[in-house]
Amino acid sequence: MTDNQIRELFDTVPFFVDNPIEVLRSSRFIRSMSHCDSASVNTGLIYGTANPVYQGMTWREFLSHGKKMKKNLDRFTVNPEYYLSHERSGTPPFFCFQDGKGYVAEDGNHRACIAKFFLYAQPSPLLHGVHLVEVQTDARMENLFSRLKRLLPP
């Protein structure tokens, strides 16, 4: 999708458009975990996904080639208010925020991508009514564990 096409849809071309979609990595050492069935997430803090199909694509590539993107973009052009509303119909997007970085954990990759672009130019970057799991990991323990594994024979 060209800059002009993105600008036509969202009024601006966000800085992250050519950033790669990151991988949600599991951690062996979790300090805390919380869950909320109806949360609001800052779409500016969404960096990636658990879905291997989209990992490594840029946000621009995903906007252009996502499996259900055309259908979701058509819905967006008819009803952009969906992305501003506190109400959700159907299955809400499911996010995991791990150590402050957001990832689409299950459902909602296409909607999250559109929300990330659309809400970038809005007064509030918050997407409401989503499922959310927040995880804080112990990076120090993860590092120690990795170092210890390297010391052990194969």
Please report, for each region that a protein language model flagged, where it lies by residue.
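Short alpha-helix boundary/capping and kink motifs at helix termini
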Residues: T2, R7-E8, V13-V23, R28-V104
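A short, basic-hydrophobic beta/loop patch
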Residues: E87-R147
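Primarily interfacial, aromatic-capped hydrophobic alpha-helices that serve as membrane anchors
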Residues: R147-P154
